[in-house]
Amino acid sequence: MDPVPLFNPCEMGRFTFSHRIVLAPLTRARSYGNLPQSHAILYYSQRATKGGLLISEATGVSSDAPCTNTPGIWTKEQVEAWKPVVDAVHAKGGIFFCQIWHVGRASDLEQEPISSTDKPVEKNEDMDFPVPRRLAVEEIPDVINHFRIAARNAIDAGFDGVEVHGAHGFLLEQFMKDGVNDRADEYGGSLQNRCRFALEVIDAVSTEVGPDRVGFRISPYISYYGCHDSDPDALGVYMARELDRRGVLYCSAVEPEMVAATTVVDGETTTTTMSRRMMIPHRLHGMREAFRRGMFMVGGGYDRDAGNMAVASGYADMVVFGRLFLANPDLPRRFQLDAPLNKYDRATFYTHDPVVGYTDYPFLDDDREAMSDHTG
């Protein structure tokens, strides 16, 4: 069998990775009352492999930070609830990072949310978002401290490190992107000012747990929750350079969305949706060049072939898989064997059932021995 680039081992800092297939941080809406539940023990342990990296679902840093039914890590009870989940991953030899976040104006809680602005997310068919309160400059250190404490709590829960969530339209990105940030103080205006908050969070978290335990997720080209930027190339490269300078373990970047290509032939218009790698090859290349000291991860619509190509070409050190890993708990094995994949069921992504669409996806051999020790 030909070598599979995704299975080239690598070392970075204190960690040795047996393969380069990373579980994406996936919100699953099954942490009732913002508390990790026993069924998460099975879910994460199913996807753990020796020397494989897993990133937890986004985990709130304070009582106003999460969405409904997503976990937190600001209380002792939450820390204790995470411990058996982390232990189950470690029992399989996995490496486990906790993604920490604050949703900002994308909140679904009843309390008034905070943001870089006082403009709400535009109403959509699923949700009418509340009007946020513009975070005062003097309040920002408190939020930074919440991230710092959450990082310490994650390490106390046994996690190997933390990933700061700076992507997908949540609080830190609401500051970074000029499509949302309309401030006129030291946290708004210039690119450097808009990125100040996120970098101060990185500095505080790195000081608390060490930069070699810290990663950052960024999505310059994605406009979730109305969060867009006029120059995503500049934003991505600037943040990658600053993260590299700080010596964090990794930068995890999300590829641009698929785009519709329109062609006109003999007066007839044809619209075709093409892969982002066909339309904009190596769009993250500038970020990759700017971030060289640590691991550069890419994610967003990758499959086995594209992942192997990304690693083999040096475009990425590791590849983050979301929906494929969700539906295939043994995804590394399937990729190694080039075996068929389960199809994911989108309708169960965010339901609250502790089994259906969560821990009931079959293994390649339907071998549930890996599950039997962690039935909760």
Curated annotation (Swiss-Prot):
Gene Ontology MF annotations: FMN binding; oxidoreductase activity
CDD domains noted in UniProt: OYE_like_FMN
Cystine residue pairs: none
UniProt keyword list: Fatty acid biosynthesis, Fatty acid metabolism, Flavoprotein, FMN, Lipid biosynthesis, Lipid metabolism, NADP, Oxidoreductase, Oxylipin biosynthesis
Signal sequence bounds: none
Pfam family, one: Oxidored_FMN
Binding site for FMN: P25, L26, T27, A58, Q99, R217, G301, G322, R323
Keyword hit for Flavoprotein: yes
Biological processes, Gene Ontology terms: fatty acid biosynthetic process; oxylipin biosynthetic process
Assigned protein family: Belongs to the NADH:flavin oxidoreductase/NADH oxidase family.
Name of the protein: Putative 12-oxophytodienoate reductase 13
Organism name: Oryza sativa subsp. japonica
Top-level taxonomy: Eukaryota, Viridiplantae, Streptophyta, Embryophyta, Tracheophyta
